[in-house]
C-alpha cells in the first residue's frame, strides 16, 4: 500500500508529464492564418468578463476581409466560448483553453479544442489570436517548485533560510554569545568548561527548536530537503543530536563546510550544495526504481517488464505501480476491418504504419482510425487498471538502467504471476486485444 505522500507524488509527476506532452504537441501546431485562440484565466479571475470579451471579438471578426480567415477566426472563437460554457466558475487552479484550426507536421488542418485545469494555480490571464498557440505562461507551471531548507550555523549565531526555484529567502536568524575556550588550568578552568558545555548545549537546543518551528507546518515538514552548513562542528553535532526533530533528520541531504556565517554563508552554502539539490529531484524516481530492482534481485516474482508481460499484468489487475519511460517510443493504433470490428495494435514508433491503411501478416487490410503515442494512452487509461503511473527519466543512474536494461516499461506487482518476459521489439507488433 502507498501512503498519502507517495500517492500525491505519483499524481504530481503524472500531471506534470501530461502537461509537458500537451505543451510539446501545441508547440508543433501551426496555423495558416491568425485563427488560433489561446485563453488563460487566472485562478483569481471570473469567467464572465472573458465570455463578454469573446462575444466582442466575434463582432470584430466580421470585419476581416478574407472570407476564409474570417470563418476560421469565428469558428475558433465560437469553440472557445463553447468550452468556457462548460464551467460555471473558474476552477481552483485557473483555466487553460486552446482552440483553432491548425496542422501538425505534414498532416492537413483540423480543429483543435483543448480545455484543462492546471495541476497547480496559474497566476496569469492571457488572450491571443495568432498563427500559433501561446504556451509561454503554461510552461512556467513546469518550473521546479520544490522548497529546500538551509541552516547556517557557527559560534556567532544561526540563520534559517529556504530556496525555491530561483528565490532565496531568509526566514529567521539570531546571534549567540558563546564563551571562548579557557586557556588557564585549575578549578576555574573546569568550571569554565562546564559552563561552556552547558551554553553550547543550550545553543543546540535553541537551534533545534527553531528548526522545528520554521520547517514543520501542521506536523509535517514543509521542505523537500535540508542543508546543514557552518564553519565549525555545530552542524554535525546537531545532526547527531537527540534534540534534532526526528521528522527533519531524514531530510538532511548534505552537510557543507563554509567559510562565512550569516547571509554570505547562506550564498556559499547554496553554491556548494547545487549538485545535491539537483539529485533530490530524482529521489522519488530512485526510490521506486530501487524497489523494482529489489523485487528482481530477491526473485520475488512481484515484478514485470517488457510490453507484452506488462500489458498482461495490467489486464489481470496485478500491477501496483506501472513504470514507463517519459520518451517511450511506441504508438497504439485503433484498427477497423471490413466488418467494422475494431482492434488495437501497439508498434515501435519506427515500425508504425504510415497513412490510413494497414495490412497485417495474414493479408487482412484495416483502416487506421486512431494513432496515439502509447505514453499518452497510458496517461488517459492507467486508472482503469487500478494502478499508479510512474514516469521514469533517464537522468538518474537507476532510471537510465531501467530504460536501457528493461526497455523503459515495467511494473511492481501486487502478487506473483507467471510471465514470459517477452518484449514487443522482438515481434512485428503487439496485439493488445489478446489482453484488453
UniProtKB/Swiss-Prot annotation:
It is found in: Cytoplasm. Keywords: Cytoplasm, Protein biosynthesis. Gene3D superfamilies: 3.30.1330.30, eRF1 domain 1, eRF1 domain 2. The keyword Secreted does not apply. It holds the Pfam family eRF1_3. The keyword Disulfide bond does not apply. One of its GO terms (molecular function) is translation release factor activity. GO terms for cellular component: cytoplasm. SUPFAM superfamilies: L30e-like, N-terminal domain of eukaryotic peptide chain release factor subunit 1, ERF1, Translational machinery components. InterPro entries: eFR1_2_sf, eRF1_1_Pelota, eRF1_1_sf, eRF1_2, eRF1_3, Peptide_chain-rel_eRF1/aRF1, Ribosomal_eL30-like_sf. Belongs to the eukaryotic release factor 1 family. Directs the termination of nascent peptide synthesis (translation) in response to the termination codons UAA and possibly also UAG and UGA. Heterodimer of two subunits, one of which binds GTP. This is Eukaryotic peptide chain release factor subunit 1. It comes from Dileptus margaritifer (Ciliate).
Amino acid at each position: 500500500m502507498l501512503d498519502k505522500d507517495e500517492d500525491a507524488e505519483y499524481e504530481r509527476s503524472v500531471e506534470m508529464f501530461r502537461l509537458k506532452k500537451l505543451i510539446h504537441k501545441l508547440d508543433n501546431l501551426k496555423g495558416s492564418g491568425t485563427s488560433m485562440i489561446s485563453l488563460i484565466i487566472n485562478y483569481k479571475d471570473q469567467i464572465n468578463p472573458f465570455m463578454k470579451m469573446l462575444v466582442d471579438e466575434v463582432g470584430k471578426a466580421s470585419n476581416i476581409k478574407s472570407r476564409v480567415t474570417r470563418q476560421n477566426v469565428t469558428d475558433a472563437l465560437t469553440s472557445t466560448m463553447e468550452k468556457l460554457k462548460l464551467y460555471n466558475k473558474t476552477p481552483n487552479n485557473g483555466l487553460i483553453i486552446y482552440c483553432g484550426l491548425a496542422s501538425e507536421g505534414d498532416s492537413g488542418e483540423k480543429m483543435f479544442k483543448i480545455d484543462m485545469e492546471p495541476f497547480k494555480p496559474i497566476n496569469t490571464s492571457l488572450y491571443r489570436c495568432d498563427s500559433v498557440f501561446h504556451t509561454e505562461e503554461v510552461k512556467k507551471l513546469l518550473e521546479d517548485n520544490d522548497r529546500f531548507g538551509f541552516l547556517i550555523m557557527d559560534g556567532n549565531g544561526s540563520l534559517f533560510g529556504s530556496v525555491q526555484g530561483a528565490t532565496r529567502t531568509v526566514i529567521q536568524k539570531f546571534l549567540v554569545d558563546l564563551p571562548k575556550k579557557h586557556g588557564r588550568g585549575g578549578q576555574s578552568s573546569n568550571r569554565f568548561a562546564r559552563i561552556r558545555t552547558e551554553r553550547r548545549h543550550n545553543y543546540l537546543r535553541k537551534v533545534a527548536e527553531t528548526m522545528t518551528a520554521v520547517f514543520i507546518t501542521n506536523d509535517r515538514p514543509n521542505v523537500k530537503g535540508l542543508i546543514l552548513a557552518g564553519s565549525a562542528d555545530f552542524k554535525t553535532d546537531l545532526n547527531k543530536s537527540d534534540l534534532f526533530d526526528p521528522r527533519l533528520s531524514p531530510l538532511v541531504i548534505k552537510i557543507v563546510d563554509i567559510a562565512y556565517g550569516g547571509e554570505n554563508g547562506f550564498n556559499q552554502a547554496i553554491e556548494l550544495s547545487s549538485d545535491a539539490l539537483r539529485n533530490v529531484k530524482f529521489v522519488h524516481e530512485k526510490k521506486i526504481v530501487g524497489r523494482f530492482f529489489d523485487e528482481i534481485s530477491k526473485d520475488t516474482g512481484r515484478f514485470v517488464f517488457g510490453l507484452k508481460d506488462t500489458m498482461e499484468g495490467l489486464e489481470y489487475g496485478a500491477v501496483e505501480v506501472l513504470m514507463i519511460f517519459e520518451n517511450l517510443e511506441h504508438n497504439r493504433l485503433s484498427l477497423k476491418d471490413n466488418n467494422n470490428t475494431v482492434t488495437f495494435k501497439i508498434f515501435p514508433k519506427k515500425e508504425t504504419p504510415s497513412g490510413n491503411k494497414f495490412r497485417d501478416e495474414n493479408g487482412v487490410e484495416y483502416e487506421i482510425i486512431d494513432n496515439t503515442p502509447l505514453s499518452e494512452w497510458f496517461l488517459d487509461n492507467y486508472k482503469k487498471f487500478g494502478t499508479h503511473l510512474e514516469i521514469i527519466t533517464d537522468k538518474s543512474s537507476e532510471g537510465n538502467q531501467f530504460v536501457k536494461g528493461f526497455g523503459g516499461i515495467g511494473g511492481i506487482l501486487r502478487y506473483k504471476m507467471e510471465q514470459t518476459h517477452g518484449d514487443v521489439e522482438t515481434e512485428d507488433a503487439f496485439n493488445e486485444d489478446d489482453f484488453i
